[in-house]
């Protein structure tokens, strides 16, 4: 492990005196492992009062197994149109890797992968493949809000495979749907904090630490002295407020009441218990999760397509009926009653709709008002839902073309002009008279 990853002071600054959302069993393993690295002589549970010596801490760690080996982390994959985002190990605010790395996953990496998947046209849905005991509070609520935002763009499902506790439960709660395996552990909706006191150990080593500060609360919770009661009460208030915020978020995401969430008292649930508690929706085998989600997305798509087709059919039928009424202007009441009582087949409805549409178009193009306004009449006829009556009113108010106006004026002039002189041969009497005229 690199020196940067073994920066123990930095790790201690994030692990102590900061609220953590960790599953209890993992928290014991975590602090036992950290105790050996930081020289902590004992661990004390503030609630139960139980203490572990350094030797007992190491024994507890040994029973839990060695976690220094390589962790299998899956890369970002798109499987059957579903983006699979692994979320494993301890959740931390930031890492340099988008993927789970060295036993931890960064909230920043989860957000970045979510945003990429949401904008990927090849992705129909997103599956968070979760195996995490939780982690830092810092960044957790923002990450959960991003999940809730993305689920409005594309379905985001969470799979507890085989754990999403504490901060992991917060993220899973923000998903559209939550799947659990039969042995998955979920829940632990609570907050914890650890305080370390090196004062006695430093005193034995002859080391004296002097803190020089300004501001009465500047060194609250420092690791070189006993935790005063008033400081502990302040930290406890922070824990209670954070837990309340945690419960409110889970309530907003899942629909459970805040009190129901608080009543879990940070309990951990397994498999079906999580469904009974309202923290999960479906029990699945982890290998079937992709298929289950794909089938659900396909069924949803079919329902949406069917709904659109039904609406379009209804709209066409209503439009055709209205158009036919406009053309004929008279619809006997008995005919409407019979139509309501009868259930015509689809072909009859289509035939009636086509006939009504043809009548509507021809009624607009051939009406008296369309003369001299042919282009406008064509546009009106192409307008969906435009009735003959409305089109005639619009055309009547519109000016005619210049050619139509000239033709109309000439017609009026010809109607008012005197009758033309008739051409023909003169009568025979007139001819005779002309011939008899003396010269």
Swiss-Prot record:
Region (Disordered): 303-327
Positions in coiled-coil regions: none
List of catalytic residues: 166
UniProt xrefs under CDD domains: S49_Sppa_36K_type
Biased amino acid composition, Low complexity: 313-327
Top-level taxon of the source organism: Viruses
Pfam families: Peptidase_S49
Gene Ontology biological process terms, A to Z: proteolysis; viral procapsid maturation
Keywords noted in UniProt: Capsid protein, Host cytoplasm, Hydrolase, Protease, Serine protease, Viral capsid assembly, Viral capsid maturation, Viral release from host cell, Virion
Enzyme class: hydrolase
Biological function: Assembly protease promotes icosahedral procapsid assembly. Autocatalytic cleavage may release the capsid scaffolding protein. The protease domain catalyzes the cleavage of the capsid scaffolding protein after complete procapsid formation. Assembly protease and cleavages products are evicted from the capsid before or during DNA packaging.
Oligomeric form and interacting partners: Capsid assembly protease interacts with capsid scaffolding protein Nu3. Capsid scaffolding protein Nu3 multimerizes and interacts with major capsid protein gpE.
Protein name per the record: Capsid assembly protease C
Protein source organism: Escherichia phage lambda (Bacteriophage lambda)
